[in-house]
Amino acid sequence: MSSHVPADMINLRLILVSGKTKEFLFSPNDSASDIAKHVYDNWPMDWEEEQVSSPNILRLIYQGRFLHGNVTLGALKLPFGKTTVMHLVARETLPEPNSQGQRNREKTGESNCCVIL
């Protein structure tokens, strides 16, 4: 599909945890929730083993970050007419914005300084 992407659309290559991939065309106005619903409603036959019970548990990961449902592709400044790769995972909830490691670092009260002579 990536051989011809309309100039006003964004081609998403979605990768499952299993490594299976599929490409879908979306508008820049489509949100992560819209994408999850579209993929759920058009679940590829070769992804049958990974079929989920609801579109509400499908999550997109882009550049190492989970996308919240209301984030649009346009807001991510994805290039039109090109293919962008994202991961698609089944997960009930999104992780907290601060990881446990970040919270632990904040609680230590240590500070680092650099002395330049």
Swiss-Prot record:
Positions where lipid (S-palmitoyl cysteine) attaches: 113
Subcellular location: Cell membrane
Domain of life, per lineage: Eukaryota
Ubiquitin-like domain boundaries: 10-88
Lipid-modified sites (S-geranylgeranyl cysteine): 114
UniProt keyword annotation of Methyltransferase present: no
Keyword set, alphabetical order: Cell membrane, Lipoprotein, Membrane, Methylation, Palmitate, Prenylation
CDD domains: Ubl_UBL3
Protein name (Swiss-Prot/TrEMBL): Ubiquitin-like protein 3
